[in-house]
Amino acid sequence: MAKTKEESAAAQTVETEAGGGLLDKILTDGRMARDDYQKERAKDMIGEFVSQVMSGELTMSKNMDVAINSRIAEIDRLVSAQMNEIMHHEDFQKLEGSWRGLHHLIKNSLTGPMLKIKVMSVTKKDMLKDFERALEFDQSAMFKKVYEEEYGTFGGAPFGALIGDFEFGNHPQDMALLESISQVAAAAHAPFLSAASSGMFGWDSYSEMSEVRDVAKIFDRTEYMKWRSFRESEDSRYVGLTMPHVLMREPYGAATKPTETFRFEEDVDGKDHKKYLWGNAAYAMGTRLTEAFSMYGWCVAIRGVEGGGLVQGLPTHTFETDEGEVAMKCPTEVAITDRREKEFADNGFIPLVHCKGTDYAAFFGTQSANKAKKYDSDAANANARLSTQLQYIFAVSRFAHYLKSMMRDKIGSFMSRKDCEMFLNQWINNYVTDDDTASPATKAQYPLREARVDVSEIPGKPGCYRAVAFMRPHFQLDELSVSLRLVADLPAPANG
C-alpha cells in the first residue's frame, strides 16, 4: 500500500515536470513573455484557459477564428460591465463632467494675448473654510487671488468673469458661500457664474419641474429666508446661477461613439436619466462670454438667438421607447417653455432653453441673482431693473477696470479737476453711439447710448477727486406682448 502511494506521487511529479516543460515551450515558441513577470502572468492565463476547457465552462469550436472571436466578445462584455460600474458612479461622473466642461470652454474660446483663461482647482468646502477663517471677506485668500493680485496691482490684468463649477442649493452653507463670493466679485467687478442645483428648488432632479405649477411660490416658503435675503443684497447682482444641466457627451457604443481599444457598449438606453453624463451650464455661458469678447471686446452680446446667446453643437442621443418610437434625449436635461423660462428669470436664475428637435439651445436672459427694488417712479424702477441684468453689469465692470487703471497712471501729474473730467469724458465717449438704428454688431462695439463722467473735489483732501460715471446702455428686447383683433376695416395707425 505504501509502495503504491510512493509510485503515484512520483508519477505526479514527473507529469508536472513534463507539463511545466511543455508550458514553457509554448511560452517560448509563442513569444508570449519578455520577462519573468510576464511569463508567470502568461502561465496563469493559459492555466485558467485549460481549466475552463476541462471543466466545460468554455466550449471549443473546430473553427479557431470563431472560437477566438467568441472569447474576445466575452472579454469585451465583462470589461464593459466593469467600465459601466465605474463610469456611472456619481463621483466619477462629477469628475468627468468637470473636465469635459472645462474642455468645452477652452475649445470654444479664441484665447490669446487679449483673452486668457486661468484655472484654479478648489472645492466649495475649501472656499467656505477660507472665508470662515478670515475676519472679513477682503482678508480671505480668494480676495487676494482675485482682487489684490490683479485688479489691485499696478500692471495687473483684472478678471472679467469668474466661473465656478459648483452647484448651489438652499443649504445655509451654500448661502453663506454665495454671499462671500458675491462680495469678492463685486469688489473686483468680475461677475461670478455658477449653477443652481435641483435641490435649490426642493427637487431631487430637474425632471420634477413639470410637477410644479408656479416656481415663485417655492421661494415664498420659510426655509428660503436666506435666499430672499441674499437677493436683496447689492452684491448679488454680481452672481449668475445657470440651470439646468447640459449633456457633456454621447454614450459610448458602436452606433454612437465607438471606442478603439475594445468593443465598449455603455449601458445607456434613454430610460435611466442618471446614466447620462451631465455637466455645468455655466461652462456654456462662459463660451458666450468669450465669443462676445473675441468679436467685440465686450461681454454684452451674450443673450438671445441672434444676440450672442446661442449654444450650438450640443451632444444628442436617440433611443427607442417602449412604444417602439425613436426619441431624442433633451441635451439640456429638461425642456423649458417660454412661460417657465420667464418664471426662472424672475426668480434670479439663468435658464438654458433647448430648441426642440435640434442640437442647439439659447440663453434668452442673463438675470443676476439680484431682485430689483421697487420705487414710486418709472425711471427709478427702470434703473433698478437694468442693474440686475448681467449683460449690463459686464459692460459697467469693464469701464470700472479701465477707469482705475487710467487714473492710477495719472497719479502725480498736474491735473486739475476740470482737466480730469474732460479727459474722462473724452475717453468714455469713444464707446457711445446715439444711432438707435445701428446694427447689433455696432451696438455691441459701442454698448452705450449716452455717458457722462462728473468729477468733484473731496473736501479736506487737496488733489483727491471723486468721479461718478453715468451710463445709459442700448436696451435689448426682453419681451413683446402681442394683441390680436379681428376687424372688418383697418383703422388708422396710432401717431408716434
Residue ranges of predicted features:
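Extended, regular secondary-structure scaffolds
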Residues: 151-331
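Long, charge-patterned amphipathic interaction tracts in eukaryotic proteins
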Residues: 97-170
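Short, glycine/acidic-rich hinge or "gate" loops at secondary-structure transitions
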Residues: 90-97, 115, 202-203, 438-445
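Generic, well-ordered alpha-helical scaffold segments in large soluble proteins
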Residues: 49, 78, 82, 98-105, ...
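Short, hydrophobic/π-rich interface segment
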Residues: 419-444
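C-terminal edge-of-domain segments
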Residues: 452-496
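N-terminal-proximal low-complexity accessory segments that begin disordered
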Residues: 2-125, 132
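Long, contiguous, structured domain-core segments that constitute the functional module of a protein
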Residues: 263-422, 479-482
